């Protein structure tokens, strides 16, 4: 197969591992910077051009699109879909996962466990919003934040009101969620490939830090997940329409609750913690499932 990896940096661990896994199985693989792609949309024969030349045809495309380039990156991916290239994750699924509010609405509708979550516009509704999620302490989360950036723990109602007021002044959109204290600053990252959890790790925030992201100094270790946690991760991936994703789960007293679904999960932490060849599993999934033009969207739906 000829495989394209949409990535801005070929030296990143995840990109390198995917290339190694594909090449070891005899596939041709090329890293394509999505921001250097430009598209011919007006004709009946859609094209993608790259650094001054028409891009050759690929059998499959692996999107490793950073959150900061979601809009343009998914536009490029849609163009690949229109050309009949098999996408590991479709543009629609990535767009859903990157919209924290939309993804929470979809997960809630399908009965997936999640923390009490509120969203409001008017400052007059702040007190009621706090009550909706059970009162302080609360977690206030920017909709466009990643890797723990833009996430604040407000331990009192006064602190929460101050943070909310400041964010409204910046015209920022945010969610207010209940704080799952019993999680103890830890979460479970489940790596889903093709409707199965193929690896899982526990991420523990450093002392005094409620965020468990490895980018925030957290540590990772192998963990045994429960059948309910496994089912929750698989269902979340299915609801958002993702073949491959990282599902972040908190262990609440009420059971597993979803914090986030990452459509471009990093591989370094989970491969190191579990010793599993996740990159190889991803390439094997493409081998089993790739068919020309096999995409639910074909670029037609947003």
UniProtKB/Swiss-Prot annotation:
Annotated residues for binding of Mg(2+) 2: 260, 262
Cofactor: Mg(2+); Mn(2+)
UniProt binding sites for Mn(2+) 2: 260, 262
Keywords for the protein's UniProt record, in alphabetical order: ATP-binding, Ligase, Magnesium, Manganese, Metal-binding, Nucleotide-binding, Protein biosynthesis
Residue numbers binding Mn(2+) 1: 248, 260
Binding residues for Mg(2+) 1: 248, 260
Coiled-coil regions, chain positions: none
GO molecular function, one term: ribosomal S6-glutamic acid ligase activity
GO cellular component, one term: cytoplasm
Disulfide topology: none
Any single GO BP term: translation
Class of this enzyme: ligase
Binding site for ATP: 141, 178-179, 187, 211-213
Annotated EC: 6.3.2.-
Cofactor note: Binds 2 magnesium or manganese ions per subunit.
Domain ATP-grasp: 104-287
Stated family: Belongs to the RimK family.
PANTHER family recorded: RIBOSOMAL PROTEIN BS6--L-GLUTAMATE LIGASE (PTHR21621:SF7), RIBOSOMAL PROTEIN S6 MODIFICATION PROTEIN (PTHR21621)
Protein name (database record): Probable alpha-L-glutamate ligase
Organism from which the protein derives: Halorhodospira halophila (strain DSM 244 / SL1)
Phylogenetic lineage: Bacteria, Pseudomonadati, Pseudomonadota, Gammaproteobacteria, Chromatiales
């Amino acid at each position: 197969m000829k495989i394209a990896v949409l990535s801005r940096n070929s030296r990143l661990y995840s990109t390198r591992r995917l290339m190694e896994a594909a090449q070891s199985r005899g596939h041709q693989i090329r890293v394509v910077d999505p921001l250097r792609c430009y598209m011919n949309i007006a004709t009946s024969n859609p094209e993608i051009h790259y650094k001054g030349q028409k891009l050759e045809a690929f059998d499959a495309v692996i999107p490793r699109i950073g959150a900061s380039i979601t809009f343009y990156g998914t536009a490029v991916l849609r163009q690949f879909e229109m050309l009949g290239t098999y996408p590991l994750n479709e543009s629609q699924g990535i767009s859903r996962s990157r919209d924290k509010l939309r993804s929470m609405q979809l997960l809630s509708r399908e009965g997936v466990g999640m923390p009490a979550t509120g969203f409001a516009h008017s400052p007059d509704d702040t007190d009621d919003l706090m009550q909706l999620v059970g009162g302080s302490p609360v977690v206030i989360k920017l909709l466009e934040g990643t890797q723990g950036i833009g996430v604040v723990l407000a331990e009192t109602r006064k602190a929460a009101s101050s943070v909310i007021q400041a964010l409204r002044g910046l015209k920022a959109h945010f969610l207010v969620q209940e704080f799952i204290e019993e999680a103890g600053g830890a979460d479970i990252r489940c790596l889903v490939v093709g409707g199965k959890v193929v690896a899982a790790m526990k991420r523990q925030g450093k002392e005094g830090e409620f965020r468990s992201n490895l980018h925030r100094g957290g540590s990772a270790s192998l963990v045994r997940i429960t059948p309910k946690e496994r089912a929750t991760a698989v269902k979340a991936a299915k609801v958002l329409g993702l073949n491959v994703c990282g599902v972040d789960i908190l262990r609440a007293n009420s059971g597993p609750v979803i914090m986030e679904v990452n459509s471009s999960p990093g591989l370094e932490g989970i491969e190191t913690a579990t010793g599993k060849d996740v990159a190889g599993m991803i390439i094997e999934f493409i081998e089993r499932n790739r068919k020309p033009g096999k995409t639910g969207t074909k670029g037609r739906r947003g």
